[in-house]
């Protein structure tokens, strides 16, 4: 199964954020967790700042604050007859990830890959609205992070 990951980095600095490593991580998780498709899967990732994610959060989610990650899953009810099977878009604020890594006492890598995993799982249909779903999603996040050595 071909998986296409389109990564855009709109923020200066953060040289330790390596697109090739991120792309590989996304592809491995999607390949393990998503049923095989006959056509290529497409996912986009935007790495940005607090100001941009705040604006997106306000405009699309009616929340007037910056956040760490926003996922827009492609609507499964809509017909997708294009060349790609579009899973959706993930937007991550690298500034917010840095803040949270300090707040929670995690390494920057651990926090970044936690947030990225969270976004990927949303695209795969996980959510955390109901407590039972939240527990299932948290368990899956920790399982994935453990495989890659990102421990708390």
Task: Give residue ranges: language-model regions.
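Periplasmic solute-binding protein
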Residues: 121
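An acidic/histidine-cluster motif and surrounding catalytic segment
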Residues: 1-113, 124-152
């Amino acid at each position: 199964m071909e998986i296409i990951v389109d990564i855009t980095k709109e923020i200066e600095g953060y040289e330790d954020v390596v697109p090739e490593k991120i792309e590989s991580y996304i592809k491995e998780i999607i390949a393990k967790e998503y049923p095989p498709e006959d056509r290529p899967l497409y996912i986009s990732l935007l790495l940005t700042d607090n100001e941009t994610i705040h604006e997106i959060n306000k405009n699309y989610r009616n929340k007037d604050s910056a956040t760490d990650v926003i996922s827009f899953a492609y609507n499964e009810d809509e017909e997708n007859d294009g060349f790609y099977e579009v899973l959706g878009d993930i937007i991550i604020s690298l500034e917010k990830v840095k803040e949270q890594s300090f707040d929670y006492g995690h390494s920057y890598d651990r926090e970044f890959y936690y947030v990225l995993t969270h976004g990927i799982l949303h695209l795969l249909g996980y959510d955390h609205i109901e407590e039972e779903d939240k527990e299932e999603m948290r368990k899956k996040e920790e399982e994935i992070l453990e495989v890659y050595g990102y421990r708390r």
